[in-house]
From Swiss-Prot:
The glycine cleavage system catalyzes the degradation of glycine. The P protein binds the alpha-amino group of glycine through its pyridoxal phosphate cofactor; CO(2) is released and the remaining methylamine moiety is then transferred to the lipoamide cofactor of the H protein. This is Glycine dehydrogenase (decarboxylating). Residues 1-21 are annotated as: Disordered. One of its GO terms (cellular component) is cytosol. The glycine cleavage system is composed of four proteins: P, T, L and H.
């Protein structure tokens, strides 16, 4: 061994002590100490703390460190979590009520649910680098259209309850009789669905009438009806005549339908329904103690422009080939704001993809066989119980029977408990039992033994089971497109999944510098527990003694989030940031009502706010009043004072984002809060930019009363290509009593206040990700993450500001965790639009930053703390090379219309075509930077034509000829 190596080895040995080596913050935060020093030098600063002192106003800084547990190591945290998981008891749950155990095909679990190539992508705003996901979502829409028998479907909603509430709002929006204010809900709907619908109705002044669909006297005061199919107690009812009755009085009919049942039973469309809603959970998604699961929403073509949620449509690209895209975006909150069809942005893309793949893997025959097997097991069970003297209350059923157990009910439940089986318990002594895909002969024998029935020849009975009665039987075909006929072996399925994955750019490819989106690392260790059965196989309505592990996670996470936000209480129920906004505003509304100030209905919102803000305010029943911004991007204090004073008697709230959507820490934020409070209002803080606050300041310190957090931004839940998300809210002490409750579960605030999500704790299984993240980082790690997010953003701003002016800075010349680059001058000087730069970045291997928000013609960049200096430099180099291309257009070196920017992105097919008629070389199109020779991401399509797609709307799979 030479002396140099000996000295190096000795030095390394001296450094290694007893401390654990698998610490996490150094894995999560991109820049190392040397890189940090280089970045600070570029900024002319001597330390990160000096940067923070200049960027973050001293008046809002926390006086002490966060009181959180010491950071754990990756190995240790998984050991600890296994111990917590063991406190959950995994019973066989036959509770039903819209939630079912299912078998998740391994090829789908491993290659989608557990694959960062799928779960780290962003919402497919940039269509050219999202074609894989878009195709999977188009498959989902086609699946929903076929099974429901309706004409158009969106690409998922948050859950069944939310979808039903959205259906009510659509019916209300399109009603022809402006005086109609009543909405009928069948008492046979799932209780949690009714709960969410009633919550949504109250602020809008809608009167929900719950009752028997057979006896209700509909009249022109009703604008809509909601039915459950099959009913929550298992009854299968043909609603055709009732739907006709509703149409006779001008009411829109919605059917909440079980997708698997629709493979055997008459579809909602066949019954004349206008809307079908539901959940795709039993198509390959774990129970997860309530979520996440993909809700669905299908309707008639005439209502397409009033639909909520994302809609995938077929268009064409620059080469005339088919290209998929988000369609009819003018319906959505980021454009229509308080006039939007819904406040929902992030939905459940990853879960919708999984459900569509489940349908593809099994195909129509496979799904029908699964449904038939469940129906046969249920029929045998019902027949044997009847023969034993038990009364079954529903004559026709699919998978659920309700049993009148009488005096034996407690004995039966005790025997079920001894076999680790859950049933649904009704208050009137009935028992509900719902069978599912996982049930086998041994399970059925156990069920019969619970009812003291033994020695039954089940296999013989299986042969003799009658089919679904003709009057209920489905007569129409479904899933006829070749995609549902072609991938039934694991090899073919694996290759199809991989093919689609290769068409999408995710964090496995490069940084995704989307402003206000916080596309940070979603670490593998954080993701591990999501698919553990101790968490994944728990029914949301399982008894509390079976969910002690979840209780520990919820209590600890709520405590940690209270510490981070400076608030007194947290609700984890909202299953998206949009729902967090809605829940927070409802808490404010209820607070004012409790003080006999229900007349407070004005919500002040800065003009720069996220589009969800005004959309959520409208949902919560508030009147939106817009507040101006000054030339520096801050809230205009004089305008705020004037409008707060003008509405002093009816001011309910101000919604504000901090740091602002302009990427700066406003110096006057505490004064802003004081102005609103002095006029009787509450301050709602949008937590979209919380990644710049953690450990440095907090909503509570600033003076806010409520704030939603995006766990899928700040706290590492992956975006999933457009969901799932989690949007918990933190509130000050006086608002704690007004947090959302749930009709089926008593939580910390009771259940007097209605639910905003179908499940009591929303998307419970993925809050584990945020729990692990906080436990791994600890107080110091979280604060350093915040510091580095601010450092990275300022480094990019500094490197690019000479050629791309940074539109807004704080008073000391620094930005927060994101910056806005002004590209507007290039439109005049070179005819180059911001979209041209965004699409050209694809050729360099990058997802574009946020385009034209909050200022048209700009790019908003948020690099997050997870990106290394090498990646930041690569992005900056791409932007600088693009600037040179713009100069080449300006000085005539490149043509004004035929140039790499206008023709971007360039596909492999384009640059290898026999014909190349462009005025620049192929190599400049394909390899504009040296690093691309080492690794190149190729877009699958050229630039997609948005206008063509909306004018020629197609939202289901194209015929097979289009693929030839």
């Amino acid at each position: 061994m030479n002396s140099t190596l000996q000295n190096q080895t000795k030095t390394n040995l001296e450094k290694v002590g007893t401390d654990p080596l698998d610490t996490f913050p150094r894995r999560h935060i991109g820049p190392n100490l040397q890189q940090t020093a280089e970045m600070l030098k570029e900024l002319g600063l001597s330390s990160v703390e000096e940067l923070i002192d200049k960027a973050v106003p001293v008046g809002i800084r926390l006086k002490k460190s966060l009181d959180l547990p010491k950071a754990s190591t990756e190995h240790k945290i998984l050991q600890n979590l296994k111990g917590i998981a063991s406190q959950n008891q995994v019973f066989r749950s036959y509770i039903g009520a819209g939630y079912h155990s299912c078998i998740i095909p391994g090829v789908i679990q491993r290659n989608i649910l557990e694959n960062p190539g799928w779960y780290t992508a962003y919402t497919p705003y940039q269509a050219e680098i999202s074609q894989g996901r878009l195709e999977a979502l188009l498959n989902f829409q086609t699946m929903i259209i076929d099974l429901t028998g309706l004409e158009i479907s969106n690409a998922s909603l948050l859950d069944e309850g939310t979808a039903a509430a959205e259906a009510m709002f659509l019916a209300y929006s399109v009603r022809k009789n402006e005086t109609a204010k009543k909405f009928f809900v069948s008492e046979l709907c799932h209780p949690q669905t009714i709960d969410v619908v009633v919550t949504r109705a109250n602020p809008l002044g809608i009167e929900v009438q719950i009752g028997n669909h057979e006896s209700i006297e509909l009249n022109e005061d009703f604008f809509g009806v909601l039915l459950q199919y099959p009913a929550t107690d298992g009854k299968v009812i043909d609603y055709t005549s009732f739907i006709q009755r509703s149409h006779n009085v001008g009411a829109i009919s919605t059917v909440a339908a079980d997708l698997l049942a629709l493979t055997l039973l008459k579809s909602p469309g066949e019954m004349g329904a206008d809307i079908a809603v539901g959940s795709s959970q039993r198509f390959g998604l774990p129970l997860g103690f309530g979520g996440p699961h993909a809700g669905y929403f299908a309707t008639k073509d005439e209502f397409k422009r009033s639909m909520p949620g994302r809609l995938i449509g077929v268009s064409k690209d620059s080469q005339g080939n088919s290209g998929l895209r988000l369609s009819l975006q003018t319906r959505e909150q980021h454009i229509r704001r308080d006039k939007a069809t819904s406040n929902i942005c992030t939905a459940q893309v990853l879960l919708a993809v999984i459900s569509s793949m489940y349908a593809i893997y099994h195909g129509p025959e496979g799904l029908k066989n699964i449904a038939t097997r469940i129906y046969k097991f249920t029929s045998i069970f019902a027949n044997v119980l009847k023969n034993a003297g038990f009364s079954i209350t529903n004559e026709f059923f699919f998978d659920t029977i309700t049993i009148q157990a009488g005096a034996k009910v407690q004995e039966i439940l005790n025997r079920a408990y001894s076999k680790k089986i859950n049933f649904r318990e009704y208050k009137d002594g009935k028992i509900g039992i719902t069978l599912d895909e996982t049930v086998n002969l041994e399970d059925l024998k156990d069920l019969l033994e619970i009812f003291e029935i033994k020695n039954t020849d089940i296999e013989k009975l299986f042969v003799d089971v009658s089919n679904v009665p003709d009057s209920f039987k489905r007569k129409t075909s479904y899933l006829t497109h070749p995609v549902f006929q072609s991938h039934h072996t694991e090899t073919k399925m694996l290759r199809y999944i991989r093919k689609l994955e290769s068409r999408d750019l995710s964090l496995t490819t490069s940084m995704i510098p989307l402003g206000s989106c916080t596309m940070k690392l979603n670490a593998t260790t954080e993701m591990y527990p999501v698919t553990w059965p101790e968490f994944g196989a728990i029914h949301p309505f399982a008894p509390a003694d079976q969910t002690k592990g979840y209780k520990i996670i919820f209590e600890q996470l709520e405590k940690w989030l209270c510490e981070i936000t400076g608030f007194a209480g947290v609700s984890l129920q909202p299953n998206a940031g949009s729902q967090g906004e809605y829940a927070g505003l409802l808490a404010i509304r209820r607070y004012h009502e409790s003080r006999n100030e229900s007349y407070r209905n004005v919500c002040l919102i800065p003009i720069s706010a996220h589009g969800t803000n005004p959309a959520s305010a409208a949902m919560a029943g508030f009147q939106v009043v817009v507040v101006s911004c000054d030339p520096n991007g801050n809230v205009d204090l004089e305008d705020l004072k004037a409008k707060a004073e003008e509405h002093k008697k009816d001011l309910a709230a101000l919604m504000i984002t901090y740091p602002s959507t302009h990427g700066v820490f406003e110096e006057s934020v505490k004064e802003i809060c004081q102005i609103v409070h002095s006029c009787g209002g509450q301050v709602y803080m949008d937590g979209a930019n919380m990644n710049a606050q953690v450990g440095l300041t907090s909503p509570g310190e600033i003076g806010a009363d409520v704030c939603h957090l995006n766990l899928h931004k700040t706290f590492c839940i992956p975006h999933g290509g457009g969901g799932p998300g989690v949007g918990p809210i933190g509130v000050a002490k006086h608002l704690v009593p007004f947090l959302p409750g749930h009709v089926l579960v008593n939580n910390a605030t009771g259940n007097e206040h209605g639910a905003v999500s179908a499940a009591p704790w929303g998307s419970a299984s993925i809050v584990l990700i945020s729990w692990v993240y906080i436990a791994l980082m600890g107080s110091e790690g979280l604060t350093n993450a915040t510091r580095n997010s601010i450092l990275n953003a300022n480094y990019i701003a500094k490197r690019l500001e000479k050629v791309y002016p940074v539109l807004y800075k704080g008073k000391n010349g620094f930005v927060a965790h994101e910056c806005i680059l002004d590209l507007r001058p290039f439109k005049k000087s070179a005819g180059i639009e911001v979209e041209d730069v965004a699409k050209r970045l694809i050729d360099y291997g990058f997802h574009a930053p946020t385009m034209s928000f909050p200022v048209p013609g700009t790019l908003m960049i948020e690099p997050t703390e997870s990106e290394s200096l090498e990646e930041l430099d690569r992005f900056c180099e791409a932007m600088l090379l693009i600037y040179q291309e713009i100069l080449d257009v300006q000085n005539g070196t490149l043509d004004k219309t035929d140039n790499p920017l206008k023709n971007s992105p360039h596909t492999a097919a384009m640059v290898t075509s026999d014909r190349w008629d462009h005025l620049y070389p192929r190599e400049r199109a394909a390899y504009p930077a040296s690093w691309l020779k080492d690794h190149k991401f190729w877009p699958y399509v050229g630039r997609v034509d948005n206008v063509y797609g909306d004018r020629n709307l197609v939202c289901s799979c194209l015929p097979i000829e289009s693929y030839q």
